[in-house]
Amino acid sequence: MINPSSMENFNMLYQLSKVEVGQHFYWQIGDFEVHGQVLLVSWFVMTIIISLSIFGTRNLQTIPTGTQNFVEYVLEFIRDLAKTQIGEEDYRSWVPFIGTIFLFIFVSNWSGALVPWKLIEIPNGELAAPTNDINTTAALALLTSISYFYAGFSKKGLRYFKRYISPTPVLLPINLLEDFTKPLSLSFRLFGNILADELVVGVLITLVPLVVPMPLMLLGLFTSAIQALIFATLAAAYIGEAVEDHH
């Protein structure tokens, strides 16, 4: 005779086994395969950001209210962040880049925490935050690396490469290694935190629906915002380091 409690344990383990990592909905584009679910949610995120920008600036007022007030607050926050990390002289041209990085990661992270993507069925895998995919975070990290290389080289020219042998040529291997570790740390930090948060919430919802996961979901929202801030701050700091004049 089968014990009912054993059946309950079996059903619970079966539900947990459905919490999967690495499932992808592939799109075939020529000879390349792309992660379709990442593109779908990325388009959703970009639509939110663009819509907010349009609604916040379509009828500008001297005394901002509503959406315009919110957009101006976000812009001031990003501007202050860039100014602090990059410096008064060079920050203005980098505000759009830092703002785009911050907003994309922030909205992506929150979309994964707030939007019930699991209710939308796709042929394979499941929809989730774009930052839940290592390809997205790696692309953002590489874009940041290219940006600070460009920032330093465009301002200093060939003098930029002097930083690799300063204050002594002995540090050349370490300085070169640092350029490889920066994008790695950026991408894996963001990917690991977002993936872990979604997995923990997914498992707890399976075990104890609604009651226990709610505080963790709220904590996840806070963590998601912090991760966006950390990524944008480090990106701005790397650019500031590249354009800084050493005397």
Curated annotation (Swiss-Prot):
The chain crosses the membrane at residues 36-56, 95-115, 134-154, 199-219, 220-240. Gene3D superfamilies: ATP synthase, F0 complex, subunit A (1.20.120.220). Disulfide bonds: none annotated. InterPro entries: ATP_syn_F0_a_bact/chloroplast (IPR045082), ATP_synth_F0_asu (IPR000568), ATP_synth_F0_asu_AS (IPR023011), F0_ATP_A_sf (IPR035908). It holds the Pfam family ATP-synt_A. Its main location: plastid. One of its GO terms (molecular function) is proton-transporting ATP synthase activity, rotational mechanism. SUPFAM superfamilies: F1F0 ATP synthase subunit A (SSF81336). It is found in: Plastid, Chloroplast thylakoid membrane. GO terms for cellular component: chloroplast thylakoid membrane; plasma membrane; proton-transporting ATP synthase complex. Keywords: ATP synthesis, CF(0), Chloroplast, Hydrogen ion transport, Ion transport, Membrane, Plastid, Thylakoid, Transmembrane, Transmembrane helix, Transport. It is a multi-pass membrane protein. Key component of the proton channel; it plays a direct role in the translocation of protons across the membrane. Belongs to the ATPase A chain family. F-type ATPases have 2 components, CF(1) - the catalytic core - and CF(0) - the membrane proton channel. CF(1) has five subunits: alpha(3), beta(3), gamma(1), delta(1), epsilon(1). CF(0) has four main subunits: a, b, b' and c. This is ATP synthase subunit a, chloroplastic. It comes from Mesostigma viride. The lineage of its organism: Eukaryota, Viridiplantae, Streptophyta, Mesostigmatophyceae, Mesostigmatales.
